[in-house]
UniProtKB/Swiss-Prot annotation:
One of its GO terms (molecular function) is rRNA binding. PROSITE patterns: RIBOSOMAL_L15 (PS00475). Keywords: Ribonucleoprotein, Ribosomal protein, RNA-binding, rRNA-binding. The gene is rplO. One of its GO terms (biological process) is translation. The keyword Ribonucleoprotein applies. Part of the 50S ribosomal subunit. This is Large ribosomal subunit protein uL15.
Length: 148
């Protein structure tokens, strides 16, 4: 009966691991031109991956986009009056920190209140900006607005 195979006895099959060919190391093993053929750009240097063989490249075929991105543009986070009513059914004083605490907007960004939906509770809202319809609806419900 033979011994069980042990992990340290395992060897790869003969010819399974061929040594890597080191090119340019003598005439017998891809010496001189090292498998690149003779002459031409590809024999002398590597062509960039973006080169399309003289065809007009993709980045030049595509049209230029007009305009620019305004770095000074302010992106407001919006919250509607209906969302405020759902989040604060008891009414009262509401600041941006309270709106953030309820998870309606993210912190550290300006907040604009829009007039989508209906409102019936008295809210005294402080935010960065308000739409005209939001101001009308909040004041019609007996509340007030303050731009901070």
């Amino acid at each position: 009966m033979s011994e069980p195979i042990k992990l340290h006895d395992l060897r790869p099959a003969k010819g399974a691991n061929k040594p890597k060919t080191r090119v340019g190391r003598g005439e017998a093993s891809k010496g001189k031109t090292a498998g690149r053929g003779t002459k031409g750009t590809k024999a002398r240097k590597q062509v960039s991956a973006a080169f399309e063989g003289g065809q007009m490249p993709l980045h030049m075929r595509l049209p230029k986009l007009k305009g620019f991105k305004n770095p000074a543009k302010v992106y407001y986070q919006v919250v509607n009056v209906s969302d405020l009513e759902k989040a604060f059914p008891q009414g009262g004083e509401i600041a941006v920190a309270d709106i953030v605490a309820k998870g309606l907007v993210r912190p550290k960004q300006p907040v604009k209140v829009l007039g989508n939906g209906e409102i019936s509770v008295k809210l005294n809202v402080t935010a960065t900006k308000f739409s005209k319809s939001a101001v009308e609806k909040i004041e019609a419900a007996g509340g007030s607005v303050t731009e901070a």
